[in-house]
Structure formats: C-alpha cells, structure tokens
C-alpha cells in the first residue's frame, strides 16, 4: 500500500464562518441545492459526528451513482472538517481510501481560503492515476465554487 499526499487551496468571497456552516453544519440541505449533480445526502450510520457515514447520491453521465463519505473529525472552533471517501464511484478499484483534511481561514476582504490536504491510500503497489487526480481536483474546485455561488445568490442564509 502506498500513501500519496497532495495539497490545494481555493479562495472565496464568502466569510469563513458562513462558508463552514454551509459546507459542514447544513451540508445535507445546502449541497443538493447548490451542486446540480448531487441529488441527495443521507446519513447511513452515526449521529453526524466522527464515524458517521453519509451516502451522497449523484447523477453522473446520465447515471445515478453514489459515494460513501465517512466523517473523521469536526473542529468547529478552528473551522476544520476531515472526511474520507470509503466507497462508491469516488473510489477507483486501485484505491483503498481517499482522505481529506480541510480547514477554512480568513482570506482577503472578509473572504475565505479553503485549504485541503488529500491523502490517497492505494491498494498493493498501485500508483494514483494522474488523470484521476486532475479530475478529482476539478470536481473539488467546481464543488467549492458551486457552494460559493449558492451563498452569494442567497444572502439571507446565515
């Protein structure tokens, strides 16, 4: 098994606390409204804290698919949220687990900087596929931008 680590940042015009609330605390309701491909989010196991497993149902290429998302840690005080993809279409056959350590910090002009560390644990001697990595980054960037756009269009959301 190999572990490969990547880091990325995204900027937003939305304040960190408001963005965190939408991405973490109210995610089950906000994300399906903001991200066209995601149809629903349901808790499969747990109470919303660490260890909780959520099923995200999405439409991709005209097909209904799902991703299993396990919450690893929630740090409201520091606007941190760690989770892993543990099953479904988000997990290629060569990958054991993909973990995300995320944190929001103050950005310019009252906005945010979203920082993420991605750890890919492969099965056996498998190497991460560069194209899969680029596609995953593009999906992550689009997801972050969709939430930002939703919040910009809904200033009443606090």
From Swiss-Prot:
Trans-zeatin 1 binds at residues 8, 83. GO terms for molecular function: abscisic acid binding; calcium ion binding; cytokinin binding; melatonin binding; protein phosphatase inhibitor activity; RNA nuclease activity; signaling receptor activity. Transmembrane segments: none annotated. Trans-zeatin 2 binds at residue 60. It is found in: Cytoplasm, Cytosol. It comes from the Eukaryota. SUPFAM superfamilies: Bet v1-like. Ca(2+) binds at residues 32, 35, 38. The keyword Nuclease applies. GO terms for biological process: abscisic acid-activated signaling pathway; defense response. Trans-zeatin 3 binds at residues 69, 81. Its EC number is 3.1.27.-. Disulfide bonds: none annotated. GO terms for cellular component: cytosol; nucleus. Keywords: Allergen, Calcium, Cytoplasm, Hydrolase, Metal-binding, Nuclease, Pathogenesis-related protein, Plant defense. Belongs to the BetVI family. Class II ribonuclease (RNase). Binds to cytokinins. Interacts with melatonin. This is Class 10 plant pathogenesis-related protein 2D. It comes from Lupinus luteus (European yellow lupine).
């Amino acid at each position: 098994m190999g572990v490969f680590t990547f880091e990325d940042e995204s900027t937003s015009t939305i304040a960190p606390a408001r963005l965190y609330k939408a991405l973490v605390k109210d995610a089950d309701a906000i994300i399906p409204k903001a991200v066209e491909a995601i149809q629903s989010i349901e808790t499969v196991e747990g109470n919303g804290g660490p260890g909780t497993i959520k099923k995200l149902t999405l439409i991709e290429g005209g097909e209904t698919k799902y991703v299993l998302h396990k919450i690893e840690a929630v740090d409201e005080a520091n606007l941190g949220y760690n989770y892993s993809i543990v099953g479904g279409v988000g997990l290629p056959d060569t990958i054991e687990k993909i973990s995300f350590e995320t944190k929001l910090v103050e950005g310019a002009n009252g906005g945010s900087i979203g920082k993420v560390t991605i750890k890919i644990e492969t099965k056996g001697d498998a190497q991460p596929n560069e194209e899969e990595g680029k596609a995953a980054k593009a999906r992550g960037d689009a997801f972050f931008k969709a939430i930002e756009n939703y919040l910009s269009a809904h200033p009443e959301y606090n």
